[in-house]
């Protein structure tokens, strides 16, 4: 029984929470922007965003493994995943996905109608992403659109009218997510070529790091624009300074071909962006 539970935990990647964090940070940034618009933050909305990030990321991991189960069996990094290794059957994985989806929908019933509509649309993208790797040259774009939508969903929890700031944030987040997932995909580029899976590193080739860096700087520019539009204090430049240091550190790791470590740096980038927004809104 214990080993079965552990396999379900691994199937949902709950043992590797960085994916939860990278979905959570965009969502919290959107929620914080909604707080600026409305002048308050509802504690219930924070809980919805926290729980929702766990459920949605878990759903995404399960449907991804269902879709990629035959590929995962022949890739060294993924062949021990519960579904690929046979520790969980396809039927069990589908049942688990349905349970997670129902739990996610029940959570959405606590939200405004606008939030529910946006989230249901985004749920289609969650299902589409694993398939997009087969027919889209840059599937990371679908991931960026999907993960970035967390900011819009959480913003709609706080505000029914969309501001210019949330639009800027959304496009900045899409650029950032495409950027950091391209670093992640560099780790698997040889296996992806072998099994016929598309990715931005395969599409961009030797220009991958340059383009990923350019997209990353688009994200930073979006943060500066939001700071200007919302009259953040001069202290926000301290946040941007920390983010630039992390950007430099990420590139040093990439130069050493430590792509997975470079990818993980983005967890801290998201964290400090959220802390910077929080400080400006509540304390400065």
Predicted regions and their residues:
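Multi-pass alpha-helical membrane architecture of UbiA-family
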Residues: 1-284
């Amino acid at each position: 029984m214990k080993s079965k539970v552990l396999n379900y935990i691994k199937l949902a990647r709950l043992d590797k929470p960085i994916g939860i964090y990278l979905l959570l940070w965009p969502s919290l940034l959107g929620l914080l922007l909604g707080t600026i618009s409305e002048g308050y933050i509802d504690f219930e909305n924070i809980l919805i965003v926290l729980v929702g990030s766990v459920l949605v990321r878990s759903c995404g991991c399960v449907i991804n493994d269902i879709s990629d189960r035959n590929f995962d069996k022949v890739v060294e990094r993924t062949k021990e995943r519960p579904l690929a290794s046979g520790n969980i059957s396809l039927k069990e994985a589908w049942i688990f996905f349905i349970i997670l989806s129902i739990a996610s929908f029940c959570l959405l019933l606590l939200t405004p109608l606008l939030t529910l509509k946006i989230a249901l649309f985004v749920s289609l993208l969650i299902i589409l992403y694993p398939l997009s790797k087969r027919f889209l040259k840059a599937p990371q774009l679908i991931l960026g659109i999907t993960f970035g939508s967390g900011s819009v969903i959480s913003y709609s929890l706080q505000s029914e009218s969309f501001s210019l700031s949330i639009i800027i944030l959304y496009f900045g987040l899409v650029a950032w997510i495409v950027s950091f997932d391209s670093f992640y995909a560099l780790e698997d580029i040889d296996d992806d070529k072998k099994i016929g899976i598309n990715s931005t590193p395969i599409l961009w080739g030797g220009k991958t790091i340059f383009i990923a860096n350019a997209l990353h700087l688009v994200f930073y520019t979006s943060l500066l624009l939001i700071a200007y539009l919302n009259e953040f204090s001069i202290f926000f430049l301290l946040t941007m300074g920390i983010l630039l240091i992390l950007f430099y550190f990420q590139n040093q790791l990439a130069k050493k071909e430590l792509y997975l470590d470079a990818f993980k740096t983005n967890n801290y980038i998201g964290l400090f962006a959220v802390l910077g927004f929080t400080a400006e809104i509540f304390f400065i």
